[in-house]
Amino acid sequence: MVREDIRNIAIIAHVDHGKTTLVDQMLKQGGVYHENQQTVDRVMDSGAIERERGITILAKNTAVHYGKTKINIVDTPGHADFGGEVERVLKMVDGVLLLVDSFEGPMPQTRFVLKKALELMLKVLIVINKIDRPDARCEEVVGEILDLLIDLEADESTIENPILYVSARKGTATLDLDTPGTDLRPLFDAILKYIPAPEGDPDGPAQVLISTIDYSEYVGRIGVGRITRGVFKAGMNVVHTNVQTGVTSQPWRLGNLYQYDGLKRVDAEEVRMGDIVALSGAADLSIGDTVCAPECIEGLPFVKISEPTVTMTFQVNDSPFAGREGTYVTSRHLRARLMRELQTDVSLRVSDTDSTDAFEVCGRGELHLSILIENMRRQGYEFAVSKPRVIYREIDGVKCEPIERLVVDTPQASAGAVIEKIGRRRGTLEHMSGQDRVRLEFLVPSRGLFGYRSEFMTDTRGEGIMSAVFERYEPVKGDIPHRSVGALVAHESGVSTPYALFYAQERGTLFIGAQQNVYEGMIVGQNSRPDDLVVNVCKQKHVTNMRNASASEDAMRLISVHPMTLEECLEFIDDDELLEITPKNLRMRKRILNAGDRARQWRYKQD
């Protein structure tokens, strides 16, 4: 049986192509907000980091009513590092809106998520956004999307579906570029016409596949999924089972049932086939579990989540400043927090190491792990992490490494430098197009991209756009240069002085300013030469009774201090270095703090 009063859709798009803004407008025009109600932009990006960076990390659910139809909307992450979120969420919907920027066109992440949607046989509706951009190239972008659909072997009905042209900022949609839209009605109508209604047995034994897990201080774990069969009622007895593990729970009583209405989660006494529901009552409910009636225990297969490609070591901070700034500093705290993350992030892997104070954490990419680090830091955790490393695999007896598809959009003048740098990092140019702005497509090892983003922004004078997505594993490509410059390393512990920094800046770029606490072995800057250099940044100017206006500390000006962001620190550190993370500071340091001990270690390795 088909439920015509409901549609379940996901919006898939590349980072910053405007999907959260489009959802805002759909909510406004669907009557979720009262007239004259004050609203914030990008309501779906509810996390602090999401608002700051303008990216969606966790998939969100909302619902809007159009006529007599309820449209459940899932806003998904656009970055492949959060692909674990995307893959799970697609199991809850019957169709997707493919949202593409009218200038940038389809990007690697668009391809990644679209491929997953087509594998699940979901209906696709193409939406070109930002048609009011002065540099919009709608017709060319439509051609690129159709090429992509053909390349991914989409069926004819998808390719022949009408294309919608939207300005999410203005809240307008049209089927014809020559006829400007006035509201989003054409989009809503297309959703009802081309996205199929949920289908299933409304009278069979109740069954729902849990796709995401939420947590509430009041009711504990909340499982979210789409009901594939039957009816759930608050207080009824159910069990949960898992196809992969084969484990089935004892019967338990359903606690609260919730449905989505606008931006709110509202209590429901009864939910039926086709509804997206949130339910509580089991403390051990996990992603991939099927909640069903005890008289018909039947697990549903769960989507295969892509394996991690990048690993880092998270360890207890053992620097001289350990414990000063963090609330949670012990290995017990660190372990508990990582295990808690595993409950909601299916793409993450955490394992023990030889040391009780260190854990191996594997994720889908640098961004995936850096968001986890930033979240932990804001929650009061203090710890240290190693340089990101790729995860190698042995395939048919051959050591293989992850290869990424890199798409670069850059001014013509910078294209040569980009091609040369990627070539040095073992990348191969696959495709090149464009005149004033050049679009380059490479296949490059994941480790070749570590540390490249800041170099890329320098080469393109901040005008370049780069985006990469995991493609496949291939035999190891050989050595790749990591860092062409050395580090300026603090000689002693103390407080940095303007006098010492004034002379240290001649050696390279400083990362710290005056009056900052430093310790021996801490990295305070970037050397202009390839080797590390030990510098004294705590040196005081000797007081004499001679006047020397030119050497006055007042006349000493620091040329430039470059405070490092989390991503820049992760790109910069080498194998023999760590990044110390506290709620207040990021400090890069040598693993071996004493310069003499480092020299002895180096000589030992040479022998």
Enumerate the predicted regions with their spans:
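P-loop NTPase switch module centered on the Walker A-proximal segment
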Residues: 1-100, 104, 144, 213-216
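Conserved nucleotide-binding/hydrolysis micro-motifs of P-loop NTPases
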Residues: 17, 29, 79-80, 103-106, ...
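Interdomain boundary/hinge elements
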Residues: 38-41, 152-166, 198-209, 238, ...
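Canonical P-loop GTPase G-domain recognition
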Residues: 123, 133-193
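Charge-rich, low-aromatic oligomerization/scaffolding segments with amphipathic character
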Residues: 137, 289-292, 360, 366-382, ...
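Conserved nucleotide-binding/hydrolysis modules and their immediate coupling elements
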Residues: 207-312, 322-324, 485, 494-544, ...
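Long insertion/accessory domains within large nucleic-acid-processing enzymes
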Residues: 260, 265-268, 400, 444, ...
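A short, contiguous, amphipathic alpha-helix enriched in charged residues
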Residues: 319-342, 555-561
